[in-house]
UniProtKB/Swiss-Prot annotation:
Gene transcribed to yield this protein: GstD7
Xref: PANTHER family: GLUTATHIONE S TRANSFERASE D10, ISOFORM A-RELATED
GO CC terms of this entry: cytoplasm
Organism: Drosophila melanogaster
The GST C-terminal domain, residue ranges: 90-210
Gene3D superfamilies: 1.20.1050.10, Glutaredoxin (3.40.30.10)
Top-level EC class: transferase
Reactions it catalyzes: RX + glutathione = an S-substituted glutathione + a halide anion + H(+)
Keywords: Detoxification, Transferase
CDD domains referenced in this protein's UniProt entry, alphabetically: GST_C_Delta_Epsilon, GST_N_Delta_Epsilon
Protein name: Glutathione S-transferase D7
Subunit and interaction comment: Homodimer.
Domain of life: Eukaryota
Length: 224
């Protein structure tokens, strides 16, 4: 069994994505907590591992890689079965998966960061323009899922797992997914087809409580 250390904040979408990919591959991860809310990522011992001080960061027997989508692909390529459906060898299938991963990073996750995740730093959501970009991103995803059960072809791939980690995060907030019926259907199907989904839900609940506690603390500060 490989020695895989994952430096992560378990409730964060990117960390949850890697937890699920590892589960799909039957891999055990040594989870190393990096609490970014307390600045753990800036400690010298972590910066020596990852000078960009981002999470998640994977250390595989001395080999270091960060950026969750790169980690996901690396794990499947190294530890998955030959021509794994999670990331097939076929260039066109792989290209579509890559496109969806880049869509998540540059469009969907980016939109959520600038609207929803702003609350962790400012105590407030983003402005209307930021919300419009969230709706636009979900609209694209809804189109990708038209007439199919997965985001990049006819089977579950790393693109589904990574994007499910992103999309499921809206459960922390009051966001109506019914406007995007294909996305809603896909998310509801996730427990049936996604390895590690129970762990994802546990981490989601921890994140929701963390957010509630954070909001309560900020409200108390305002009243004081």
């Amino acid at each position: 069994m490989p020695n895989l250390d994952l430096y992560n904040f378990p409730m964060a979408p990117a960390s949850r994505a890697i937890q699920m990919v590892a589960k799909a591959l039957g891999l055990e991860l040594n989870s190393k907590l990096i609490n970014t809310m307390e600045g753990d990522q800036l400690k010298p011992e972590f910066v020596r591992i990852n000078p960009q001080h981002t999470i998640p960061t994977l250390v595989d027997n001395g080999f270091v890689i960060w950026e969750s989508r790169a980690i996901a692909v690396y794990l499947v390529e190294k530890y998955g079965k030959p021509d794994s459906p999670l990331y097939p060898n076929d260039p066109q299938k792989r290209a579509l998966i890559n496109q969806r991963l880049y869509f998540d990073m540059g469009t969907l996750y980016d939109a959520l960061t600038k609207y929803f995740f702003l609350i962790f730093r400012t105590g407030k959501f983003g402005d209307q323009e930021a919300l419009d970009k969230v709706n636009s991103a979900f609209g694209f995803l809804n189109t990708f899922l038209e007439g199919q059960d997965f985001v990049a072809g006819s089977q579950l791939t790393v693109a589904d797992i990574v994007i499910l980690a992103t999309v499921s995060t809206v459960e922390w907030f009051s966001f109506d997914l019914s406007k995007f019926p294909n996305v809603e259907r896909w998310l509801k199907n996730a427990p049936k087809v996604t390895p590690g989904w129970e762990q994802n839900l546990e981490s989601l609940q921890q994140g929701k409580k963390f957010l509630q506690d954070l909001q309560a603390a900020k409200e108390k500060e305002v009243k004081a």
